[in-house]
Amino acid sequence: MKKNLLKSLYFQVLLAITIGILLGHFYPELGTEMKPLGDGFVKLIKMVIAPVIFCTVVTGIAGMESMKAVGKTGAIALVYFEIVSTIALIIGLIVVNVMQPGAGMNIDPSTLDVKAVSLYAEKAAEQGIIAFLLDVIPASVIGAFASGNILQVLLFAVLFGFALHRLGEKGKPIFNIIDGFSHVIFGIINMIMRLAPLGAFGAMAFTIGKYGIGTLVQLGQLIVCFYITCILFVIFVLGTIAKATGFSIFRFINYIKEELLIVLGTSSSESALPRMLDKMEKAGCQKSVVGLVIPTGYSFNLDGTSIYLTMAAVFIAQATNTHMDIVHQITLLVVLLLSSKGAAGVTGSGFIVLAATISAVGHLPLAGLALILGIDRFMSEARALTNLIGNGVATIVVAKRCRQLDEGKLNEVLNAK
């Protein structure tokens, strides 16, 4: 029993995170030097994301009997994404108004370090809706794979899958090659995942060493408020959706616990993407559904990021005594419904989208972003965890709606001890 526990990736990552926290707290300088371990692990994962998405989507689409099924899957997924992410935005808005974590801080925006957020503001200015849509189309296929842009690779994979399906029997040899290549890629992923504890240790040691546990106290109310909101969202909103679909959210969380710990250690939901594709297939979801829903969800179904965006924006207003009436808050909500859809397509993710939103709304002081900058790293864990759970639930829901779910298989893996 003890030997099996030590071999468990779940236990190894949990132990690594604990050691990382202790090292960062007691030896901060040494902790900050561990950063390359976390960065290296995330880079290794990103290295295989593009090929794994390509193989999964192409074999999933090309292997389907009807092309109408692909269109139906995509349409159901997008409707689901829009509804659930809107609920997440509204919940974030309600909680931050009720709890008011920024009230009483009385911060003068002119005293904040504008230089600290200028880089994010510049990137945000480039991130318009038209620019985002055009960015989905790669300048070249090789460029899409080289940059690791998920949506660009996904677009090419969908087109490739459709074209391969139309070839019929002539395309069978190509299909077999890609299917075989996908097995090789998943073999590489299994090797990389052995380094997950090392990556989680390095990332956590750096975070605590650089920012310190004590720095959280001043802005801790927002962090606590955000974490509680994410937990309630997962339990009640995603839990209700899961129950209506016929499974338990708690059993599902237990099923993906290793992936959640990897995300917790690295603060990157991308680090678990390849394993999630494999796990969702093993849970009874058809490959074609998994290949479309999971990668697309990384840009269109970011529940944790949606909660973060509304809470952070209103927090800045409260902290700087900027009055936001119902009209301003509805405007903020509408802008976020559009801007939040590009959150995973930009470097810096949620923070840059937040800067873009504040610039678009115009009512909030852009300098107020400096308040969030210092604690953004600590909020990223809850964002990434909520995003991962949300995309997993979405995959099962869409698979069931499209009649592409083996419910017997799902119950078997979720109830396994």
Swiss-Prot record:
Keywords in alphabetical order: Cell inner membrane, Cell membrane, Membrane, Symport, Transmembrane, Transmembrane helix, Transport
Membrane topology (UniProt): Multi-pass membrane protein
Annotated localization: Cell inner membrane
Source domain of life: Bacteria
GO molecular function, a single term: fumarate transmembrane transporter activity
Transmembrane segments: 8-28, 44-64, 76-96, 142-162, 184-206, 222-242, 326-346, 352-372
InterPro entries: C4_dicarb_transport, Na-dicarboxylate_symporter, Na-dicarboxylate_symporter_CS, Na:dicarbo_symporter_sf
One biological process term in Gene Ontology: L-aspartate transmembrane transport
The protein's role, per its UniProt record: Responsible for the transport of dicarboxylates such as succinate, fumarate, and malate from the periplasm across the membrane.
Main location as per UniProt: membrane
Protein name: C4-dicarboxylate transport protein
Protein's UniProt keywords contain Nucleus: no
